[in-house]
Amino acid sequence: MKISEIGKLLDAQLLAGEEHLDSEVISACCSDMMSDVLAYVKDQGVLITGLINSQVIRTANMMDMICIVFVRGKKPTEEMVELAKECGIAVMCSEKRAFEACGILYAAGLSHKGGH
């Protein structure tokens, strides 16, 4: 699934990473606990979270993720957006709740392949 399609499905606003809109991902994960992402998540392209701090960007970068979707209407700070740009990570915001966002993406064919 293309990053652009994820944005459309979640009615998300793109804040960074326009150059990644045509990038393909095959899996996603959802967590507000970055320690769980580091411990249990493998080979995920998209991180769905409601946590707003720079550790989200750093964790996604360490895990080679190419897109972060902030849910529940949460908006990252300017500093977070700039850090994501430096790391080459697309950043989106959606008003949808995490459960709903995951369900929509799963129904559209995105999986949790490689994760727990």
Please place each PLM-identified region on the residue numbering:
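Feature captures the catalytic cores and cofactor-binding loops of soluble hydro-lyases/lyases
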Residues: 22-23, 31-46, 51-116
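Histidine/lysine/aspartate-rich catalytic loop segments that bind and position anionic ligands
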Residues: 19-20, 26
